[in-house]
């Protein structure tokens, strides 16, 4: 049934612009260039001769900055740094511009269902038994998420030690290029009214700001349903000083350990043909390698490069460059639970538009519809359907591996929905429970082992119980009766439906739906907002420099001990711009021009 594919896709949360403000006077988009920008090319094109034009001193083929990961933070960071310095971005995935499963809202779930080697998302399952995904595409998580855009609150900015003035300047830099005001669907309007009815007040209208009450947030989907990703922020770049290599998988960061402190000299990466290359960092003062590979990729890369817990590095025979027991520690994921709401009639597709920001530290959102049609499918895989029986268009009683495969073959372009409806979700802000990340092997292409310890702390579980009670009130509110005809007596039926949906690999108590605590444990999933692993004060300094080594920073969500705002992508992109400006000003002062 469509429930499983649709639910998994959104639970894993996580275009072409009609007018580009940034591109005026900057990089012109080539009509026939599948990579859109002339500075983007495949990793196999890298050579000493081709990179020498970016040399900062005219003597060797080196770069002032090498950014590992062209994601939500990496793209705006690279675009900003390129205003004054030579920058090389190494992205392990491809481009989003010609990928229909990334570009169109109606294909949101299909893009996440694609688990092929060239997919924009790489699936993994935490040791908690919860399905998850990490981006593998230029633009990062902004290419595979639900598109909701909302800023962090002022308290987060203060705790981060950021300059409030520069933060306020950096958010609009992102918003001008890729963010839009959504056109509310009827269901999202119903959610808005229901939240107000049950007391999530006041109504704050359409705003990017994080304020208590009910509001409408921004979206990176335009009115035509096309996604605009962080990759489009590269339109701000100086094309003469930026080079972006796709399908460039960094193997490790290279250090010179002959001095008193390890000093970064470059990186080794593999191209799409399997050939290895070494990119060199300029010897100029201030040159750096910047890790922007996300909360999974950045701690993994540090350990593969010899920075991390000594015993773990020695276990895998990785030469120890710097012992730091905190690498990979402090991992957290905001637990999400949902109540599935069947509908009497087909519902227009919508991703996150309306959000209720409660004072109990819980965010309430909703998503509806299935959106996919036979014409919209470009690559269809079903979410690991052959192994985990999650293929959504097969009725539950028929969902066996052999039946699933036969169904895919027989009905690849003739899919229909076995479930019609939507779900209301609650995300727990500021979880206390913490986990860890560790290497499985030394192959960077393989996922590390990740544990989040959902609800290990009793306070997290109690807050989830309160949140589910709130969501139950929302779905039984007067405003939702027109859609669901669900009264208070039917709530447990919906809870039972939610538990039975095969949305994780955790043991379930199917006969205990009256226990809200058990419901939380049974139905926990991710909303893609995992963070930690390279925390400030433990692995990096407040300015994101890696402690104990020279010429290395980490700028991404791995440095956060909490997820900013209702959804973090706005702050991730803002941080890329913010840190880029800070770095330029540190090196050039008033001459930076930003």
Curated annotation (Swiss-Prot):
Keywords: FAD, Flavoprotein, Signal. Changing residue 435 to R: In hth-3; fused organs and increased genetic instability. GO terms for molecular function: flavin adenine dinucleotide binding; mandelonitrile lyase activity; oxidoreductase activity, acting on CH-OH group of donors. It comes from the Eukaryota. PROSITE patterns: GMC_OXRED_2. Changing residue 565 to R: In hth-8; fused organs and increased genetic instability. Pfam families: GMC_oxred_C, GMC_oxred_N. The keyword Flavoprotein applies. InterPro entries: FAD/NAD-bd_sf, GMC_Oxidoreductase-Related, GMC_OxRdtase, GMC_OxRdtase_N, GMC_OxRtase_C. One of its GO terms (cellular component) is extracellular region. Changing residue 227 to C: In hth-4; fused organs and increased genetic instability. Expressed in roots, leaves, stems, inflorescences and siliques. Found not only in epidermis but also in all sub-epidermal cell layers. The keyword Signal applies. Residues 1-19 form the signal peptide. GO terms for biological process: cell-cell signaling; embryo sac development; fatty acid omega-oxidation. FAD binds at residues 64-91. The active site is at residue 529. Its cofactor is FAD. Probable FAD-dependent enzyme. Involved in regulating post-genital organ fusion. Required to limit cellular interactions between contacting epidermal cells during floral development. Mutations in the gene for this protein reveals an unusual pattern of genetic transmission in which progeny plants inherit, at relatively high frequency, DNA sequences different from those carried by their parents. The instability observed is not random but seems to be confined to the restoration of sequence information in progeny plants that, although absent from the parent genome, was present in the genome of an earlier ancestor. Belongs to the GMC oxidoreductase family. This is Protein HOTHEAD. It comes from Arabidopsis thaliana.
């Amino acid at each position: 049934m469509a429930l499983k594919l649709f639910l998994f896709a959104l639970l894993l949360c996580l275009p072409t612009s009609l007018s580009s403000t940034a591109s005026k006077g900057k990089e012109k988009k080539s009509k026939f260039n599948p990579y859109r920008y002339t500075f983007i090319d495949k990793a196999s094109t890298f050579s000493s001769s081709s990179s020498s034009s970016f040399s900062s001193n005219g003597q060797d083929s080196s770069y002032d900055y090498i950014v590992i990961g062209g994601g939500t933070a990496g793209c705006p960071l690279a675009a900003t740094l390129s205003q004054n310095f030579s920058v090389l971005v190494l992205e392990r995935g491809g481009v989003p511009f010609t990928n229909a499963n990334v570009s169109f809202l109606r294909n949101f779930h299909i893009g996440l269902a694609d688990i092929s080697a060239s997919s924009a998302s790489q699936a993994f399952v935490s040791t908690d038994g919860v399905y998850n995904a990490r981006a593998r595409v230029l633009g990062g998580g902004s290419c595979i998420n639900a598109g909701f855009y909302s800023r962090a609150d002022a308290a987060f900015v203060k705790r981060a030690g950021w300059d409030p003035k520069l933060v306020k300047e950096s958010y609009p830099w992102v918003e001008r290029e890729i963010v839009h005001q959504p056109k509310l669907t009827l269901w999202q309007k119903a959610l808005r009214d229901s939240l107000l009815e049950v007391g999530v007040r006041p109504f704050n209208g359409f705003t990017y700001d994080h304020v208590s009450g009910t509001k409408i947030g921004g979206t990176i989907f335009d009115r035509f349903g096309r996604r605009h990703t962080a990759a489009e922020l590269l339109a701000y770049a100086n094309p003469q000083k930026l080079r972006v290599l796709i399908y460039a998988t960094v193997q490790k960061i290279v250090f010179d350990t002959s001095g008193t402190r390890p000093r970064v000299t470059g990186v080794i990466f593999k191209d799409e043909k399997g050939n290895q290359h070494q990119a060199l960092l300029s010897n100029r003062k201030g040159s750096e390698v910047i890790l922007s590979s996300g909360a999974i990729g950045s701690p993994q890369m540090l350990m593969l490069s010899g920075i991390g817990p000594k015993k773990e590095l020695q276990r895998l025979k990785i030469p120890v460059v710097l012992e730091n027991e905190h690498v990979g520690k402090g991992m957290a994921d905001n637990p999400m639970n949902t109540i599935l709401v069947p509908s009497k009639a087909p519902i227009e597709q919508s991703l996150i538009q309306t959000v209720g920001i409660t004072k109990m530290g819980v965010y309430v959102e909703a998503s509806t519809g299935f959106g996919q049609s036979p014409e919209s499918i470009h690559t269809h895989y079903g979410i690991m359907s052959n192994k985990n029986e999650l293929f959504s268009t097969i009725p539950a009683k028929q969902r066996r591996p052999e039946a699933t495969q036969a169904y895919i073959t027989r009905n690849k372009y003739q899919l229909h929905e076995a479930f019609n409806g939507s779900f209301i979700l609650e995300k727990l802000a500021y979880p206390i429970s913490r986990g860890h990340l560790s290497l499985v092997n030394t192959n960077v292409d393989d996922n590390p082992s990740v544990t989040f310890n959902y609800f290990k702390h009793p306070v997290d579980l109690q807050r989830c119980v309160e949140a589910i009670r709130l969501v139950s009130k929302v779905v039984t509110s007067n405003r939702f009766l027109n859609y669901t005809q669900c009264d208070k007596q039917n709530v447990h039926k919906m809870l039972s439906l939610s538990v039975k949906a095969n949305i994780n690999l955790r043991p379930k108590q199917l006969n205990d739906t009256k226990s809200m605590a058990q419901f939380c444990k049974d139905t926990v999933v991710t909303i893609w907002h995992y963070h930690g692993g390279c925390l400030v004060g433990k692995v990096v300094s407040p300015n994101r420099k890696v402690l104990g080594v020279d010429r290395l920073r980490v700028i991404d969500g791995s440095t956060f001990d909490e997820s900013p705002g209702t959804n973090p992508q706005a702050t991730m992109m803002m941080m890329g711009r913010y840190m880029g400006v800070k770095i330029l000003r540190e090196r050039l002062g008033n001459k930076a021009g930003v």
